[in-house]
């Protein structure tokens, strides 16, 4: 799970305006951080299939948000992909 200070740091980096916590960019960045954390977790805990199912759910959520952003604003989509280094 993400620590509160780490989550606040991500929000402050990707927010669009001062009170922004729920824009697609912020949500995608938070999900990407969780995916990175779980990926590292699986390097040492290979048989943790319960958490692996959660990872697949998070990846699906991020995929949906990315599809939404691509449909609404392609420039913002390309920007967040580049900033986060997501392969596409």
UniProtKB/Swiss-Prot annotation:
CDD domains: Ribosomal_S15p_S13e
GO molecular function terms noted in the UniProt entry: rRNA binding; structural constituent of ribosome
Xref: InterPro entries: Ribosomal_uS15, Ribosomal_uS15_bac-type, uS15_NS1_RNA-bd_sf
SUPFAM superfamilies according to UniProt: S15/NS1 RNA-binding domain (SSF47060)
Top-level taxon: Bacteria
Keywords recorded for this protein, A-Z: Ribonucleoprotein, Ribosomal protein, RNA-binding, rRNA-binding
GO cellular component: cytosolic small ribosomal subunit
GO biological process, one term: translation
Pfam families, A to Z: Ribosomal_S15
Alphabetized SMART domains for the sequence: Ribosomal_S15
Family: Belongs to the universal ribosomal protein uS15 family.
HAMAP family reported for this sequence: Ribosomal_uS15_B (MF_01343_B)
Subunit structure: Part of the 30S ribosomal subunit. Forms a bridge to the 50S subunit in the 70S ribosome, contacting the 23S rRNA.
Job of this protein: One of the primary rRNA binding proteins, it binds directly to 16S rRNA where it helps nucleate assembly of the platform of the 30S subunit by binding and bridging several RNA helices of the 16S rRNA.
Annotated protein name in UniProt: Small ribosomal subunit protein uS15
Gene name per UniProt: rpsO
């Amino acid at each position: 799970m993400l620590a509160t200070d780490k989550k606040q740091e991500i929000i402050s980096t990707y927010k669009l305006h001062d009170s922004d916590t729920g824009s697609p960019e912020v949500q995608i960045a938070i999900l990407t951080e969780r995916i990175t954390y779980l990926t590292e977790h699986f390097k040492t805990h290979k048989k943790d299939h319960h958490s692996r199912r959660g990872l697949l759910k998070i990846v699906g959520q991020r995929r949906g948000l990315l599809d939404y952003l691509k449909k609404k604003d392609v420039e913002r989509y390309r920007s967040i992909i580049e900033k986060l280094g997501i392969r596409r």
